[in-house]
Amino acid sequence: FVLVLGMTGMSGNVKAADQTDLKTIDIMFVHDTHSHLNSFSTVVDEKQEMIGGFARIKTLIDEQKEKGPDTLVVDGGDFSMGTLVQTVFETQAAEIRMLGALGCEATTLGNHEFDYRSKGLAKMLETAAESGDTVPELLVCNINWDAMEQQGFSEGQQQIRDAFTEYGVKDYVMVQKGDVRVALLGVFGKDALACAPTCELQFTDPVEAVKKTVAEIKKNEDADIIVCLSHSGTSEDESKSEDEILAKKVPDLDVIISAHTHTKLEEPIVHGDTYIVSAGEYGKYLGSLSLEQKADGRWGMKEYKLTPIETDIAENAATPVSYTHLRAHETGA
């Protein structure tokens, strides 16, 4: 299941660059927002502060897109479960629709997307698909449909399979950002699966699935850069740090947006030519990175930052209107 957006011509490998015409790309990202569409109160430097909120994140994204219209915006999953917004997860698909309103182009599944069981996830995806809104691509490359089909789909598995078809869930997509052809793929990690007791789906090994998907991209697409949305995470114990293992085992990945462990990486973790980046949780920070292609075709980091989403950032006026409308359905107002 592959979608190609704004591309012409497919061939070969990730390309080496002409040294006289090096390409650049800007990426902004969130993950583990857990239904925190609105700002929320917390203690910062021993003071009660209102932080986060999609309206402020939208302001920063819009400001960046004024400077760089081809900025890529992505999410790493666990966009649901954590505030009262989750009560309209099925009926309004508020979280994924609001990601679309931010300009987010792709996301992946986190373990909390399964909290309302197969029926709930299926209903949410159907609601989003039928809403008429622009919603992110949903990317997961390691669902083991073959094994489930051989065993005979359960009712829940069939519900999700049908909803995936309606929504258009894929292993990867190609997107065009200026002169840069971006391959985006998503993967669901081992610990994420262990944290999803209501998940009825079966998954293949994340590393092996990413290897296979990257090989397919390199064979069939004319990609300049490969970005993985991984709901796997990192750990201080490198032997258990899933996204570090992924970076080492699949060195053709250029960037891993690392979600699940709510890690806040002030600097990227670097293995070879692969950058692992994370921006904490609940939309407290908006991650951004600027990359420049090197002569060998790989990418160097020009800038990386996590911007705190605090009250000094003006709220985009249209965004609260959107999620207030969606939340009104909690009470039938």
Per-region residue spans from a language model:
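Sec-dependent signal peptide cleavage junction
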Residues: 7-19
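Acidic, proline/serine/threonine- and glycine-rich low-complexity intrinsically disordered segments
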Residues: 320-321
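Acidic, metal/ion-coordinating pockets
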Residues: 17-311
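Short, surface-exposed beta-strand/loop "edge" segments at domain boundaries and coil↔beta transitions
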Residues: 312-317
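Conserved small/polar residues in nucleotide/adenosyl-binding loops
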Residues: 324-331
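Short, intrinsically disordered, low-complexity terminal segments
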Residues: 13-14, 180, 330
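Bacterial N-terminal signal peptides
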Residues: 1-6
